[in-house]
Amino acid sequence: MSQHLVPEAKNGLSKFKNEVAAEMGVPFSDYNGDLSSKQCGSVGGEMVKRMVEQYEKGI
């Protein structure tokens, strides 16, 4: 099981993941065993892209 650097961020990241997945049309749920690696990776990649953009706006 992975350890979160900031445990308090877990719920926020889950909500963010679900929002991004919904926008992309990827049906995320508590069980995602039926999703392809490509689908999961595209959601994660989009999350990172948006987080980097937000960070750069704050610089």
From Swiss-Prot:
GO BP terms: DNA topological change; sporulation resulting in formation of a cellular spore
The family this protein is said to belong to: Belongs to the alpha/beta-type SASP family.
Name of encoding gene: sspC1
Protein name (database record): Small, acid-soluble spore protein C1
Pfam families, sorted: SASP
Post-translational modification: SASP are degraded in the first minutes of spore germination and provide amino acids for both new protein synthesis and metabolism.
Record's keyword terms, sorted: DNA-binding, Sporulation
UniProt superkingdom: Bacteria
GO molecular function per UniProt: double-stranded DNA binding
Signal peptide: none
Site (Cleavage): 19-20
Function: SASP are bound to spore DNA. They are double-stranded DNA-binding proteins that cause DNA to change to an a-like conformation. They protect the DNA backbone from chemical and enzymatic cleavage and are thus involved in dormant spore's high resistance to UV light.
Species per Swiss-Prot/TrEMBL record: Clostridium perfringens (strain 13 / Type A)
Keyword field contains Iron: no
InterPro entries (alphabetical): SASP_alpha/beta-type, SASP_alpha/beta-type_CS, SASP_DNA-binding, SASP_sf_alpha/beta
